[in-house]
Amino acid sequence: MAPPSRRECPFPSRRFPGLLLAALVLLRSSCSDACGPPPTFEAMELTSKPKPYYKVGEQVEYDCKKGYHHFAPFLTHSICDRNHTWLPISDEPCVKKVCHYIPNPLHGEAILANGSYSFGNQLHFICNDGYYLIGKEILYCELKGSDAVWSGRPPICQKIVCKPPPKINNGKHTFSDVEVFEYLDAVTYSCDPAPGPDPFSLIGESTIYCRDNSLWSDDAPECKVVKCRFPVIENGKQIAGFGKKFYYKATVIFERDKGFHIIGSDTIVCNSNSTWDPPVPKCAKELPPSSTKPPTLSHSVSTSPTTVSPTSSVSGPRPTYKPPVSRYPGYPNPDEGMLNSLDEWAIALIVIAILVGVAIISFGLHRYLQRRKKKGTYLTDETHREVNFTSL
């Protein structure tokens, strides 16, 4: 049997590199003679699927994108030029579609977010004082198919009104015959005269008004008798808020006596449940300042075993010697001030004694000299004679 014949490759291996090089040269020459992908725009797009390369002289068509329309006639195609660039065109004639104009609502205002009615923009609505908005506060310009439309109906501004305020027991409010209250209308409550000795107190806000949400600014107040007990404080006294009876919001201020301090608040107020808030304070006695207690010293006498100590008939602990506090280091000596004052007096007495002694000695010398001068000459009318005498 003859062996199978070997099949030869139509492209010998030695020729393959040459063929590959030729293909690259042809591809390079074809790419250099073509344009790349055509330009893209915000407002318009190609009417056909784009290709990676276009021959010289080849043309592409454009049209406005969805949501845009032709504002004016314009060039809608571009051509691959000989210099391998696209003929310049613009998308400015394609403009956004707009929603229809919405005027300001009665007693309100419509505000464009970006100053335009084109799709994608917003329209905000607000109402004047005394009116509230019924409907959507913001409308959006959206695309519906090929048209631009608003996302809803425009709202309206309705006048703010409140229902009559609630009635209260033991009291009344002004304008009780009015059925509808407008924005910022106000009523004032008051209490009726009480049948007993104590009057009614108005608990809460006396005046309320109609707010922008058609509700009253506060709950209705309450009329009831509020009376707190007479406040009594030991070791202290009342200095403000005197009275025989204490009704709602009565305020009392206390002061402590000397040697005491207040526990609690010195100011209390009668609240709506007839109790003092905070509670009536108390006065506690002030404690003396703490001092360090000196150590106690005790002296004991030891005796020999043969010495028998006498037995005392008095029972109890043995007396111990405690030196005064002034003998410990760091404690002042109570006699120190007395000694200082005595030293001053002693010095003064010594000085006075010296002065008195000097005066006595001076006086004695003076008397002695006077006696010596009395020994002199005695003259008479008849004769002159010298007489020596001694004064007695």
From Swiss-Prot:
Spans within the Extracellular topological domain: 33-344
Topology with respect to the bilayer: Single-pass type I membrane protein
Stretches with biased composition (Low complexity): 287-319
Function: Acts as a cofactor for complement factor I, a serine protease which protects autologous cells against complement-mediated injury by cleaving C3b and C4b deposited on host tissue. May be involved in the fusion of the spermatozoa with the oocyte during fertilization. Also acts as a costimulatory factor for T-cells which induces the differentiation of CD4+ into T-regulatory 1 cells. T-regulatory 1 cells suppress immune responses by secreting interleukin-10, and therefore are thought to prevent autoimmunity.
Protein's name in the database: Membrane cofactor protein
Keyword presence, Transmembrane: yes
Organism of derivation: Callithrix jacchus
Domain Sushi: 33-96, 97-159, 160-225, 226-285
GO cellular component terms, semicolon-separated: cell surface; inner acrosomal membrane
Entry keywords, A to Z: Complement pathway, Cytoplasmic vesicle, Disulfide bond, Fertilization, Glycoprotein, Immunity, Innate immunity, Membrane, Phosphoprotein, Repeat, Signal, Sushi, Transmembrane, Transmembrane helix
Entry superkingdom: Eukaryota
InterPro entries the UniProt entry points to: CD46, Compl-Cell_Adhes-Reg, Sushi/SCR/CCP_sf, Sushi_SCR_CCP_dom
